[in-house]
UniProtKB/Swiss-Prot annotation:
Protein name according to UniProt: Glutamate--tRNA ligase
Catalyzed chemical reaction(s): tRNA(Glu) + L-glutamate + ATP = L-glutamyl-tRNA(Glu) + AMP + diphosphate
Function in brief: Catalyzes the attachment of glutamate to tRNA(Glu) in a two-step reaction: glutamate is first activated by ATP to form Glu-AMP and then transferred to the acceptor end of tRNA(Glu).
Organism annotation: Pyrococcus horikoshii (strain ATCC 700860 / DSM 12428 / JCM 9974 / NBRC 100139 / OT-3)
Domain of life: Archaea
Protein family according to the UniProt entry: Belongs to the class-I aminoacyl-tRNA synthetase family. Glutamate--tRNA ligase type 2 subfamily.
PANTHER family (UniProt xref): GLUTAMATE--TRNA LIGASE (PTHR43097:SF5), GLUTAMINE-TRNA LIGASE (PTHR43097)
Disulfide bonds: none
InterPro entries hit by this protein: Gln/Glu-tRNA_Ligase (IPR050132), Glu-tRNA-synth_arc/euk (IPR004526), Glu/Gln-tRNA-synth (IPR000924), Glu/Gln-tRNA-synth_Ib_cat-dom (IPR020058), Glu/Gln-tRNA-synth_Ib_codon-bd (IPR020059), Rbsml_bL25/Gln-tRNA_synth_N (IPR020056), Ribosomal_bL25/Gln-tRNA_synth (IPR011035), Rossmann-like_a/b/a_fold (IPR014729)
EC number(s) recorded for this UniProt protein: 6.1.1.17
Sequence motif 'HIGH' region, residues: 105-115
Phylogenetic lineage: Archaea, Methanobacteriati, Methanobacteriota, Thermococci, Thermococcales
One annotated GO molecular function: ATP binding
Keyword entries, A-Z: Aminoacyl-tRNA synthetase, ATP-binding, Cytoplasm, Ligase, Nucleotide-binding, Protein biosynthesis
GO biological process: amide biosynthetic process; glutamyl-tRNA aminoacylation
Length: 570
C-alpha cells in the first residue's frame, strides 16, 4: 500500500477545501479512517503524512488542483454530481403575483451582512413569486438613531451592487400626516390615549399593571391633548401617545407601548423642523405595512416582540397582519457588524471609514474583493433558520473563491523582496498564462537577464537553504549556494519534470518590479505587506486578481507607479 499516495490525495483535498492549507490532524484522520489496517503502524506513517502535508502546503492553489486532477480525477466528478440547485423554501400563504415584501433600514449608518439577510430574502422571495419589493427608509428617529443624507445614498448603492432593485422607495419621514391620521382615529376609538405622566411614574405603574391616570379619561380630553402635542403646547418629554394593550401582559414592554412622542427641533435631513411629533418604530412600521400592502415580513428573531405590539393596531382596525418569518442573527466570526461600534470606531480614528476592510459592512466586503453573488449564495444557504448563525471568514472565502477563481488573472507579487543572483543562467523570457484555464487571455512575459538579480520573498527563506534545489516558477531550477543579505544560486536546468520528480519547492519571483502594497485585515489590525509586483502587470482599480502563492486581492488604488491592493483571502 502506497501510504504516501493516499496521504497526498487527502492532503490535496483538505488543502483545496480549506483555503490552500491542509490540516495535519484532519489528513491523518482521513488516511487512518479509510485504511484501518494502517492504525498499528501509526507511529511509522505519521512522519510520512507530515512530510506530504508540508509539501502540499507549499504549493500554489493552481498546482494543488493540477496535482489532484492527475492523481484523483474522481474528486472533481463527484463534486459535479453533488452540485444541486440551492434555493429557498416555499413561503406560507404566498400567491403568484401577490407577494409584497419590504426592507426597512434605518439610514443612520451603512448596512452590513446581518442586515443584508433581510434585504436579500425579501427581494428574492418577491422575485420568486413575481411580486413587489419595497425599500422603506425607517427614518423617524431624528434624535437617537439620527438619519444622515449620505446613508440614504449608500444603502441604495449597496442594494444595487447586491443586484437588488426596489420596485418602490418609501421614506417614512414623508408620511407623518398619514401616521397622525391613524393616531387620531385610534384616540377617537378609545384605543389610544395621550399620557403626560413623567416617564419614571409611568414605568412604576406599568410594572405593577396599574393603569395610568390618563388612560381612561374621555376621548374629548385625549383629542385636546393630542392637538396640544401637535401645536407645540407640550415640550419634548411632556406627552406621549400610547396604544392601549393588556396591562397584565407578561412582558411589561408590551403594556400600553408608546406610539408617538415629541422631539423639539428635530432638524431632520428631509423635513427639517416642520414636524415635532414623531412616530416610534412599531407604530410607523405597523401603519406602513398595511398601507403599502405588505404580505410577508422577514424579521430578526430578536425583534419577534414587535409583532406582539403591532398586532394590537391590526386588531383594532380589523386588518390582517402580514405573514412574519423570523430568522436568527447572522454574524461573521471576529468581524464587527454593530453600527454603533462602527460609528464609535470611525469617530475615534480606529477605523478608516464605513468601508474599512476590517468591518462587515457591505461596502467593506465589496472593497475587500467579496463578490455580491458570494453574499447572496451565503444568505440563501443559511436561509430562514431561526437559530443564530456565525459564519467563519473561511466559509465566505470558500464561496467567493469559487466565483473569483475563474475570473482572476494571475500575477507574481513578491512581499519583502530579497535579491537572488543566479550564476550560469542564460537570458530567457518566461511566458506565463494570465490564467491557467483560459489560454485565450494571453500570457505575461517576464524577462530574465544574467546581469540582473531576480527578487524572491523573505517568506520563502525557509526553502532557500544552501544545498537546496528550488524551481523559480515558470522559469528554471536552481541550486542555492549562499544566503545572506542577498542569495547566491546556480542555474541547474529548465525542465519542470526534474523539479516535479525530485519534489523541489516552487518559488515565485520578479526581475524588475513596480512597487506594491497589500493591506491585510488581521482582526483589529491592518497589516501592510510591501513588495514588488510584476513590472508590466496591467491591473486596474477594482479588479480582483490572484497574486500567486499569496492570495486573491482587489486592486484598491494606483498612485503613480505604485499599486495598492486589499487582501481578500487565499
Amino acid at each position: 500500500m502506497d501510504v504516501e499516495k493516499i496521504a497526498l490525495k487527502h492532503a490535496l483535498i483538505n488543502a483545496i477545501e480549506h483555503g490552500g492549507k491542509a490540516n495535519l490532524k484532519a489528513v491523518i484522520g482521513k488516511v487512518l479512517g479509510e485504511n484501518p489496517e494502517l492504525r498499528p503502524r501509526a507511529k511509522e506513517i505519521i512522519p510520512i503524512i507530515n512530510k506530504v502535508v508540508e509539501e502540499v502546503n507549499s504549493l500554489a492553489r493552481d498546482e494543488q488542483l493540477e496535482k489532484l486532477k492527475d492523481i484523483y480525477p474522481e474528486y472533481f466528478e463527484k463534486k459535479e454530481e453533488k452540485k444541486e440547485k440551492k434555493g429557498l423554501p416555499l413561503l406560507p400563504k404566498a400567491e403568484k403575483g401577490k407577494v409584497v415584501t419590504r426592507f426597512a433600514p434605518n439610514p443612520d449608518g451603512a448596512f452590513h451582512l446581518g442586515n443584508a439577510r433581510a434585504a436579500i430574502l425579501s427581494y428574492e422571495y418577491a422575485k420568486m413569486y413575481g411580486g413587489k419589493f419595497i425599500l422603506r427608509f425607517d427614518d423617524t428617529d431624528p434624535k437617537v438613531k439620527r438619519p444622515e443624507p449620505i446613508f440614504y445614498k449608500m444603502i441604495i448603492e449597496d442594494l444595487e451592487w447586491l443586484g437588488i432593485k426596489p420596485d418602490e422607495i418609501v421614506y417614512a419621514s414623508d408620511r407623518l400626516e398619514i401616521y397622525y391620521k391613524y393616531a387620531e382615529e385610534l384616540i377617537k376609538m378609545g384605543k389610544a390615549y395621550v399620557c403626560t405622566c413623567p416617564p419614571e411614574k409611568f414605568r412604576e405603574l406599568r410594572d405593577k399593571g396599574i393603569p395610568c391616570p390618563h388612560r381612561d379619561e374621555p376621548v374629548e380630553v385625549q383629542l385636546e391633548r393630542w392637538k396640544k402635542m401637535l401645536n407645540g403646547e407640550y415640550k419634548e418629554g411632556e406627552a406621549v401617545v400610547r396604544i392601549k394593550t393588556d396591562l397584565n401582559h407578561p412582558n411589561p414592554a408590551v403594556r400600553d407601548w408608546p406610539a408617538l412622542r415629541i422631539i423639539d427641533n428635530p432638524n431632520h435631513p428631509r423635513t427639517g423642523n416642520k414636524y415635532r411629533v414623531w412616530p416610534l418604530y412599531n407604530f410607523a412600521s405597523a401603519i406602513d405595512d398595511h398601507e403599502l400592502g405588505v404580505t410577508h415580513i422577514f424579521r430578526g428573531q430578536e425583534h419577534a416582540e414587535n409583532e406582539t405590539r403591532q398586532r394590537y393596531i391590526y386588531e383594532y382596525f380589523g386588518w390582517e397582519y402580514p405573514v412574519t418569518i423570523h430568522h436568527g442573527r447572522l454574524s461573521i466570526e471576529g468581524v464587527v457588524l454593530s453600527k454603533s461600534k462602527t460609528r464609535k470606531g470611525i469617530e475615534e480614528g480606529k477605523y478608516l471609514g464605513w468601508d474599512d476592510p476590517r468591518l462587515g459592512t457591505i461596502r467593506a466586503l465589496r472593497r475587500r474583493g467579496i463578490l455580491p453573488e458570494a453574499i447572496k449564495e451565503l444568505i440563501i444557504e443559511v436561509g430562514l433558520k431561526k437559530s443564530d448563525a456565525t459564519i467563519s471568514w473561511e466559509n465566505l472565502a470558500a464561496i467567493n473563491r469559487k466565483l473569483v477563481d475563474p475570473i482572476a488573472n494571475r500575477y507574481f507579487f513578491v512581499a519583502d523582496p530579497i535579491p537572488m543572483e543566479v550564476e550560469g543562467a542564460p537570458e530567457f523570457i518566461a511566458e506565463i498564462p494570465l490564467h491557467p484555464d483560459h489560454p485565450e487571455r494571453g500570457v505575461r512575459r517576464l524577462k530574465f537577464t544574467p546581469e540582473r538579480p531576480v527578487y524572491v520573498s523573505k517568506d520563502d527563506l525557509n526553502l532557500l537553504k544552501p544545498g537546496n534545489f528550488v524551481r523559480l516558477k515558470d522559469l528554471f531550477n536552481v541550486e542555492i549556494l549562499e544566503v545572506g543579505d542577498k542569495i547566491r544560486a546556480r542555474f541547474y536546468s529548465f525542465e519542470y519534470e526534474i523539479a516535479k520528480k525530485n519534489r523541489w519547492k516552487m518559488v515565485h519571483w520578479v526581475t524588475e518590479g513596480r512597487p506594491c502594497e497589500v493591506i491585510i485585515p488581521e482582526g483589529d489590525e491592518l497589516v501592510v505587506r510591501k513588495g514588488l509586483l510584476e513590472k508590466d502587470a496591467k491591473v486596474q482599480v477594482n479588479e480582483i486578481v490572484q497574486f500567486e502563492r499569496f492570495g486573491f486581492v482587489r486592486i484598491d488604488r494606483i498612485e503613480g507607479d505604485k499599486v495598492i491592493a486589499i487582501y481578500a483571502h487565499k
